[in-house]
Design a protein with these regions (language model features):
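N-terminal, polar/charged subdomain of small-to-medium soluble alpha/beta proteins
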Residues: 1-94
């Protein structure tokens, strides 16, 4: 799987957070083994923890956004949304 690029505003990407992100995004391998790039952008304010991810697979760009009051919960929601979209792009065997 492609390395994960992480950037953000108002957040420090700690080793613990990075490990959590790597673990959660590792789930994507089961749904798409041809991911060419992953970029995650975090935006943290007093009230919200928001994240947006852009994933590139051959022929498609998949984008998802999530937000909650907890960054770890936001990442969980984001990964679930991406998996749902990746499953839509899986080749069908008829």
């Amino acid at each position: 799987m492609a390395p994960i690029q992480i950037s953000g505003h108002g957040i420090e990407i700690t080793p613990t957070l990075r490990e959590f992100i790597d673990k959660k995004f590792d789930r994507l391998k089961k749904h798409a083994n041809h991911i060419t790039s992953i970029h995650i952008f975090f935006n943290v304010t007093k009230l919200t923890q928001a994240a947006e991810a852009t994933i590139h697979i051959p022929g498609h760009e998949i984008s998802a956004k999530a937000e909650s009051d907890d960054m770890y919960k936001t990442i969980d929601i984001l990964v679930d949304k991406i998996i749902h979209q990746l499953d839509k792009h899986k080749p069908r065997n008829h």
